[in-house]
Structure formats: C-alpha cells, structure tokens
C-alpha cells in the first residue's frame, strides 16, 4: 500500500471513504480520508470502525477536538512522516496540544518532544496539567517537570509524594556537546539546550552554566552563549587565533575568566559576552583590539587550569607545572609557585591541595591568601586529587600491576581517614564530586575506546550507577557537571521537611 499516493488522494478528495469534520472552539476543518488507514494507525479510530460501532459511523463524521490543525497534523502523519505544520504556533504551545491530542486518540506519548523544549515560567502550569492528565508521573516526566520548574514556584500546588520523587530523581545533570548541540543529561532524560558553532580543528572546549543569568556558555576559539529562557544564542570573539584551555565563572556570575593557548587571560561579561580585558601571563594588559598578539608558548608551559577563589577574589592559573595567583581587581600577581602538580581548589576556596616537588609526589596544601605551604605525606602513583569537602580530598592512586587505591585525606589534621583498593581508574577521563560520597566519572570502554559511559560512583560503597552513555565519534566532546537546580532542590527539601507528617 503506497501511503504517499493515498495521502495525495486525501488532498484531491479521490477514492476516500470518510469525510471527517474536525471542530474546536474557534475553527472547523474537513478532511477526506481512508478508514483502513485510520483504523490501522490509531486505537480511537479502530474502535470507532469496529463492528460494534460501525453502524453509527457513516461516510461522514463530526469530531470535536482541542485544536483542529494539530489534530489534522497527527492524522496526516498516519500517511506520511514529513508533514508541514498547518498552524503557526509556538513550539511550546504546539507540543502541549500535540501531546493532549495524541492522548485523546489513544496513541503512545512522545516524551522526547517535551525534552527538547525549554518551557517559559508562564507555561509551566500547562505543562504540569498536560503531564498530569495525559501521561502521568514517571521518572521521565518528573524529570521534565523538575527541569522546567520555576525557582519561586508555589510548591503547595504539588503533592508531597510527587515532590519526594522529584527530589530523588533529579539530583544532578551532565552538560555535554553532542552532534553540534549542547545537551543536558540526567539519569532519566536528555534535554536539548540548543545548537552551537563548532570548530572541528579545535580540540579544547569548556562548558559553563550561569545559574544567576540562566545562560550556558561554551568557550573555545569563540564564546557561544545560549539564553535558557529565550533559547536565543550569541557568539563573540570570532576569528580568534588561539583556543581556550579552561574557563571559570566569578562567584557573582558577572564575569568569565578564560585562559588560552598563547598563555593570555581574558575577562568578559557573562550577560553580553563583551570582552573586558586581555592580559599576559605576567599580568601586563594587552589592547583588546590586538588580543591575538602574544608570545608563542611552549606546549609544556601552556595554561591547563584556572580556579576562582571567592573569599579573596583571586584567580589561580596553572601554567605547565607552575601556579600563578592574580588579584581580579587589577590582575596583578599575588604570588607564583613552581613544581606544582594536580592542583585542586578546596571546597571553602581558601586553599589549594596539590602535589609538590620536582618529582611531584609530596602532598601539599597552599594557603591562597598567605602564600604559605603545609606539607603532607609522600605519595606514589597519584592519578587524581578531587575536592571532597571543607577539610578532605579524595586521592586516587593508579598501580599498573596491583590495581587502584582510593584514599580520603584530611589535610587539616594530616591523616588518611579511609582507603579502598577495589576500584579501577585506568580508563577514567573525567571525575567530579556531586554530593556526600558520590562522584561522577566519565570513562572509555576498555574494549571499544569510542564508547563513553558516565556513571554515578559511590567510592565508599564502591558502587556505580549508569547515568548515560554515548559514542565519542569526535575528540572535541567534553563533559562537565552542572548542579544548576541546587537552589530549587534545597527549597523542595525544606518544604518536604516542614510539611511532611
């Protein structure tokens, strides 16, 4: 059966056996259709044309619907897949009506259509009503609700049972680039944020999220900004000769500081992406018009990491094995330090925990304000140092023969408080702390190196739970953690604690 030819017959009014008139509160639309196509594609029409109802259905039928044009699109999709929308609605309004209309017809729901949309605050109640009346609450729909819920939403509108499920299901998100788009994953949904401009010659990307301005930023040879409320994007710094190796937001989210392959530091406004200033490694300013000038930096001395210290308004940049601390006020150098490896900013942002020495094997704590050192134990085969809480870090050792060891180090009291030797870290490409004893790890499959898995890992229980997985077809992909719903999570938890019996 050639459905495309049959669809053309519906347009021409030829060889059809049903005249279906769709009626809503504003419009009426008549379609000439084939009963066999409708009944084979849709439970609603299959029941209508069954023996028990066939006597009441003639060759003409009037059907009251929510929106005649959206319903017509769904019916036309029974014939062809590449249909053009018959009404000029916003994507938000269209998908809500589309979901409601499919539910009316008894068709399966296409939840992925809702995941692709950022719902504005004034549409959240409609989203909630649509999910409540049409789909129901499951892990995917609760995740969609949490993702789109306004920060100041009246939580009393939602039952405690639903809020408890919401607090359990959506604790963290992973931001990544996939097929020229920015996507946000949690363990139940994949939300499409928007398209990005990729330079495939550039292997270095940094993804940031500003919870204050509700914007995503992708920093490479350009600055690509996406507004989550309007879904509009802006690109700055075109034709930049050098690539960003790392970037960080100031605590107030007003500025982004980024470091580039020519060892320059750049500062720009988050809200407008306007370039504020460019500085050499020694803190000397560069004319922003000539921002691409600068010395060619040896690969081993290029900037690797940039950290922001909130209490002191400093940025600390790692160049090769050197650390340089700058005052954000005037970008003057506060201190410099050599032979530093694996620097990690403490949770209180007043200290840096790292490895020190020419061989890079002695644990050391740097007081950022006082430029003082506190030395700890000698370590062997240290692979990662990860911030854990205000006084401890996770240290991961990689032993080629005997496997791996996880240790928790209390740098205030200079003692190890925990050890675990069962986890294999040899294939980890990224690790970051989420909460309590839980971390996110990104790793390549041992057999198929192109296969990437992102897992939630509890280091004390030595358990992992898959969050998402994909094939890394391009080396430019980068993953990071963004807990941009932390404030809402806190509100929900406080509301549950206050209102639970």
From Swiss-Prot:
Cysteine disulfide links: none
Domain BTB: 16-87
Coiled-coil region: none
Superkingdom of origin organism: Viruses
InterPro entries xrefs: BTB/POZ_dom, SKP1/BTB/POZ_sf
One matching Pfam family: BTB
Similarity annotation: Belongs to the mimivirus BTB/WD family.
The protein's name in its UniProt record: Putative BTB/POZ domain-containing protein L107
Natural source organism: Acanthamoeba polyphaga mimivirus
């Amino acid at each position: 059966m050639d459905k495309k030819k049959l669809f053309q017959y519906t347009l021409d009014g030829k060889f059809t056996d049903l005249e279906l008139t769709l009626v809503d509160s504003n419009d009426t639309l008549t379609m000439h259709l084939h009963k066999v196509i409708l009944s084979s594609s849709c439970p609603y029409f299959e029941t209508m044309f069954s023996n028990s109802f066939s006597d009441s259905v003639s060759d003409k039928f009037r059907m009251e619907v929510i929106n005649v044009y959206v319903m017509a699109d769904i019916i036309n999709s029974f014939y062809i897949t590449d249909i053009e929308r018959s009404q000029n609605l916003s994507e938000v309004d269209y998908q809500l009506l589309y979901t409601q209309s499919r539910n009316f017809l008894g068709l399966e729901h296409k939840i992925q259509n809702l995941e692709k949309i950022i719902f504005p605050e004034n549409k959240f109640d409609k989203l909630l009503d649509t999910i409540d009346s049409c789909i129901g609450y499951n892990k995917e729909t609760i995740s969609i609700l949490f993702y789109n819920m306004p920060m100041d939403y009246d939580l009393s509108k939602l039952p405690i049972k639903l809020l408890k499920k919401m607090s359990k299901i959506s604790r963290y998100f992973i931001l990544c680039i996939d097929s020229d788009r920015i996507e946000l994953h949690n363990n139940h949904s994949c939300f499409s944020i928007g398209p990005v401009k990729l330079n495939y010659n550039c292997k270095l990307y940094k993804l940031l999220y500003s919870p204050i301005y509700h914007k995503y930023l992708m920093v490479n040879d350009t600055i690509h900004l996406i507004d989550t409320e309007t879904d509009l994007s802006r690109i700055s710094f075109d034709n930049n000769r050098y690539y960003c190796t790392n970037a960080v937001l100031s605590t107030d989210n007003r500025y982004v500081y980024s470091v580039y392959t020519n060892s320059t530091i750049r500062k720009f406004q988050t809200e407008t992406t306007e370039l504020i200033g460019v500085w050499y490694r020694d803190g000397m300013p560069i004319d922003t018009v000539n921002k691409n000038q600068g010395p060619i930096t040896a690969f081993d001395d290029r900037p690797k990491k940039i950290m922001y210290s909130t209490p002191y308004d400093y940025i600390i940049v790692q160049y090769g094995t050197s650390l340089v601390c700058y005052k954000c006020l005037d970008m003057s150098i506060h201190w410099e330090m050599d032979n530093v490896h694996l620097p990690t900013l403490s949770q209180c942002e007043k200290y840096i925990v790292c490895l020190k020495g020419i061989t890079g094997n002695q644990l050391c704590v740097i007081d950022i304000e006082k430029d003082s050192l506190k030395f700890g134990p000698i370590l062997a085969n240290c692979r990662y140092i990860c911030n854990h809480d205000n006084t401890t870090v996770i240290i991961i050792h990689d032993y080629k023969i005997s496997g791996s060891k996880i240790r928790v180090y209390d740098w205030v009291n200079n003692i190890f408080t925990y050890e675990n030797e069962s986890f294999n870290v040899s294939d980890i490409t990224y690790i970051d702390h989420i909460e309590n004893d839980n971390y996110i790890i990104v790793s390549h499959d041992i057999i198929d190196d192109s296969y990437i898995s992102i897992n939630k890992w509890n280091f004390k229980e030595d358990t992992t739970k898959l969050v998402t997985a994909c094939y890394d077809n391009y080396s430019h992909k980068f993953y990071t953690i963004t807990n941009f719903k932390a404030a809402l999570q806190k509100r929900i938890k406080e509301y549950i604690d206050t209102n639970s019996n």
